[in-house]
């Protein structure tokens, strides 16, 4: 029986969009991006998919990508099918319009995974590039009651166990846990494979599975966020430039040293 691998993926604002393109809706406390800028798949989640595909390259495995969100673009998410995933499941609902926090996201993911059935390995990106919270994988592993290993650089499955080479401040360490398990994958894994034209065309013919919250047995009362966002704003910065003048380089240097000492920089 093939190894059942689930990869979680998030659709995010393109991190390459310039700051000047953003605005903030003060009433809803939401980031507003012009429609000309398309969203992308979170880069760390592409690393997670690459880890899954490397396992699939060496043994029989089925890779299912699971995404939760609002206004998910099927065309954007199809890239993951083109990369080599076998199936794509999207969970989106009007109940998500008001925003769901990390806890609710993890609960929705857990419900969707239980609906999918038995699994061997869940791979998640180490964090999302929009908020950088890195909370969902840890909440998800708690909800499912499986062991978790974070910050993977290399993932290998053998004999009912997953061996993970993970990144730590001192270098690398190897951790091994029994399956089923959840592993978060870091960008140190390497560059994800690029979809071929043939794979992209094949992915365009594949239909994702689309579920609503009710399909997972969830209602509005279970989707209320625990986190209250008090304010959201673009940081402001003030730059002051002062030209130091003098009769020569030595005088300018002395004045510069005095200024730096006054500012307690030296």
Over which residues does each language-model region extend?
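N-terminal glycine-rich FAD/FM-binding segment characteristic of electron-transfer flavoproteins
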Residues: 1-266
